A protein has these predicted regions:
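Extreme N-terminal tail/first-helix region
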Residues: 1-17
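A generic local structural motif
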Residues: 4-7, 32-33, 104
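A generic structural micro-feature
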Residues: 12, 27-29, 60, 111
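Short beta-strand segments
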Residues: 15-49, 66
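Short, structured beta-strand-loop surface elements
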Residues: 51-123
Length: 123
């Protein structure tokens, strides 16, 4: 039987739908939302369509701690995580280029207005 850690690692190797739970910046209440994550060069990122403001980004700017909920099909797991909102233009261009290509968006549009968060998992 495969260890849970191996299944989690394998699930993180490819992008899929995921939920994250953040802490509401004004209410302090947990806020859960479904998103898509990407594995780019071994790092985990969350992004979204361009052109919309997101409360989950504001929540992460206030408190970087979140729960990263893997929802299958390989494994289900609730992972404590840290989110780093990426604002550096060069880093955004590098990370968003393959996401934009996969989604059929103009890279410059995504760099200008898509959310982008790097997710790390504390030991």
């Amino acid at each position: 039987m495969i260890a849970v850690e191996d299944r989690v690692r394998r699930a993180l190797e490819r992008g899929h739908r995921v939920d994250i739970t953040t802490t509401g910046r004004t209410t302090g209440a947990p806020r859960r939302i479904e998103l898509v994550f990407h594995n780019i060069d071994g790092r985990i990122y969350i992004s979204g369509r361009p052109g919309f403001r997101r409360s989950w980004i504001a929540n992460l700017n206030a408190d970087r701690h979140m729960t990263f909920h893997l929802k299958g099909p390989v494994v289900t797991a609730d992972l404590p995580a840290i989110g780093r909102v990426i604002t550096d233009r060069a880093e955004r261009e590098r990370v968003l280029a393959p996401i934009a290509a996969g989604w059929g968006y103009e890279p410059a549009l995504m760099v200008a207005s898509s959310p982008l968060v790097e997710v790390t998992f504390p030991d």
